[in-house]
Design a protein with these regions (language model features):
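Catalytic-pocket segment enriched in acidic/His residues
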Residues: 9, 60, 71-73, 77, ...
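Residue-level recognition of short, solvent-exposed, well-ordered loop/turn junctions
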Residues: 83, 89, 139, 254-255, ...
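Generic beta-strand structural signal
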Residues: 85-86, 108-110, 115, 124-126, ...
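N-terminal accessory regions of nucleic-acid-interacting proteins
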Residues: 151-166
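N-terminal non-catalytic cap/leader segment that marks the start of a structured domain
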Residues: 1-110, 298-302
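Structural signature of FAD isoalloxazine-binding scaffolds in flavoprotein oxidoreductases
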Residues: 103-122, 138, 295-305
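Active-site glycine-rich loop that binds ribose-phosphate moieties when present
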Residues: 119-132, 145-153
Length: 316
């Protein structure tokens, strides 16, 4: 299934995509649906926590949905599919992205957090605030949505804890993230570089894990104004989805609704920015970006089978 949150009469509603329609789960809920499931049909995190029972009723609702429970997707204002309690991020998870950055040595995934205050949805505007950054960059990333709580989860059992997947643009202020020392080495400051208003577009939907046959075999692309900027496959991750679940669960108990961002491939604007230590990757098929994001740009983050996230950049 594909779950979305959308706006209706000023209120957030939870729906499921079917063809060109959004089916409102509360409106379509079968008679006699348990109160706990009805409550879950108004909150994505509660629906995730309802696990198989919630999914079973959601499927029944979708199958029986009448016209009154349906809204054409084209007439729907989508919001981010979830308001995550925690966004765990892994950087440097594709070799070609590592190659376009100042040299680093790392044996574990890069670990940083992103604020949920920066979450926006499909169709919302990314704000380029010059007081924050002059070098606003894009990063298409696949999101893992945790469905079952766990700590110290072995990679071999990680998929038991994954509810589904989505798309995130890890919007980054490069001139806040990276400072070059006089000797040419770099200092990373991921706090201000990764956390500001509208820094985390997510969506358009959460796709349940049963819809994705192999999360390590999905084409990933980024377009800016129709120009291809990133092109890779999730199969080129250094650490797989299962390994990232194992890694992050070492530190915190993963709860339903927590999301893990799996990193971005090469092709960022940073890779063409010598002032910040950027360098072209050795792979000849990596796209070289022409510039950082500017007001008026349209950014498309696309992962096959997971979704196509579109946002426009505006000036503050």
């Amino acid at each position: 299934m594909q779950f979305v949150r959308y706006e209706r009469n000023g209120a957030l509603r939870l729906g499921a995509l079917e063809g060109n329609d959004v089916v409102d789960l509360l409106d379509a809920a079968p008679n006699g649906t348990a109160p706990g499931i009805l409550a879950a049909f108004s909150d994505m995190t509660l629906l995730i926590a309802a696990a198989d029972a919630g999914l079973a009723v959601a499927r029944a609702a979708l199958k029986a949905a009448s016209g009154a429970a349906r809204t054409p997707l084209a007439k729907t204002r989508l919001r981010a599919p979830i308001a995550p309690s925690l966004i765990l991020c892994s950087g440097e998870n594709y070799w070609d992205h590592r190659e376009e950055k100042p040299e680093v040595t790392r044996k574990d995934p890069e670990f940083f957090l992103k604020t949920s205050l920066g979450v926006i949805g499909h169709g919302d505007d990314i704000v380029r605030d010059e007081r924050v950054t002059q070098k606003l960059d894009y990063e298409t990333e696949m999101l893992i949505v945790i469905g079952k709580a766990g700590r110290h989860i072995p990679a071999a059992r990680a998929y038991e804890h994954i509810y589904g997947y989505s798309v995130m643009n890890d919007v980054t202020a490069r001139d806040r993230q990276v400072t070059l020392r006089p000797d040419g080495s770099s200092v990373y400051n991921l706090g201000p570089g990764k956390n500001f208003d509208t820094c985390a577009p997510i969506g358009p939907a959460i796709v349940t894990a049963d819809e994705i046959r192999d999360p390590q075999a999905l084409d990933l692309r980024t377009y800016v104004n129709g120009e291809l900027r990133q092109s890779n496959t999730t199969g080129k991750m250094i650490w797989t989805c299962a390994q990232l679940v194992e890694f992050f669960s070492t530190f915190v108990t993963l709860q339903p609704g927590v999301i893990i961002s799996t990193g971005t491939p090469g092709g960022t604007a940073w890779g063409s920015d010598a002032e910040l230590g950027g360098k072209k990757p050795m792979r000849k098929d990596v796209v070289t970006a022409s510039s950082y994001l500017q007001p008026g740009d349209e950014v498309v983050c696309e992962i096959k089978g997971v979704g196509r996230l579109v946002n426009r950049v505006v000036a503050a």
